[in-house]
């Protein structure tokens, strides 16, 4: 893993995060079952991928369980700022561009640095909506650039 590049006071023009909400669904109720998506390897997950996963899983759960039948939580935040050295292409690019000279790069995105087995998204729900929550997390896991697994955090005895 790389060391986090997060000192915002030294960095100009940091792109904003696309993640709109971190908690969705019924925030006040206590649900007996809790499931999470955990990554199988250390990786970097962009704010775009986190937002795509949030939209996919939240939309599925809203259609299946209704607004009050679940609580979805994003558990990571994209603090790490990613830089890119823009390379020009096309005719005359060699005259315009510096190549690897002054190659520090400009901030282009933010990512969440995730460790192995770290949980990224959690859905709390009841027994009736367990299969829907599992499918919603599977759809969210497809948006990530790393193999994931679905873990039952709480209420394993209720679903067997």
From Swiss-Prot:
In the record, biological process GO terms are: translation
InterPro entries the UniProt entry points to: Ribosomal_uL16 (IPR047873), Ribosomal_uL16_arc (IPR022981), Ribosomal_uL16_CS_euk_arc (IPR018255), Ribosomal_uL16_dom (IPR016180), Ribosomal_uL16_euk_arch (IPR001197), Ribosomal_uL16_sf (IPR036920)
What GO molecular functions are on record for this protein?
Answer: structural constituent of ribosome
The record's annotation in CDD domains points to: Ribosomal_L16_L10e
A GO CC annotation given for this chain:
ribosome
Q: Which SUPFAM superfamilies match?
A: Ribosomal protein L16p/L10e (SSF54686)
Superkingdom of the source? Archaea
Give the keywords, sorted.
Answer: Ribonucleoprotein, Ribosomal protein
Q: List the disulfide bonds.
A: none
Q: Does the keyword Lipoprotein apply?
A: no
Protein family: Belongs to the universal ribosomal protein uL16 family.
What is the protein's name according to its record? Large ribosomal subunit protein uL16
Q: What is the lineage of its organism?
A: Archaea, Methanobacteriati, Methanobacteriota, Methanomada group, Methanobacteria
* Gene responsible for this protein: rpl10e
């Amino acid at each position: 893993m790389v060391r986090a590049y997060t000192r915002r006071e030294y960095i100009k023009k940091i792109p904003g995060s696309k993640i709109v909400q971190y908690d969705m669904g019924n925030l006040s109720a206590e649900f007996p079952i809790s499931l999470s998506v955990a990554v199988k390897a250390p990786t970097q997950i962009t704010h775009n991928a986190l937002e795509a996963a949030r939209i996919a899983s939240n939309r599925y759960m809203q259609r299946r369980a209704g607004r009050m039948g679940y609580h979805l939580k994003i558990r990571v935040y994209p603090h790490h700022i990613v830089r890119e050295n823009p390379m020009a292409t096309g005719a005359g690019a060699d005259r315009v561009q510096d190549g690897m000279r002054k190659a520090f790069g400009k901030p282009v995105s933010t990512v969440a640095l995730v460790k192995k087995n770290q949980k990224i998204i959690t859905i709390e729900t009841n027994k009736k909506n367990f299969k829907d929550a599992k499918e919603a997390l599977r759809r969210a896991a497809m948006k990530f650039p790393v193999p994931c697994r679905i873990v039952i955090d709480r209420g394993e005895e209720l679903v067997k």
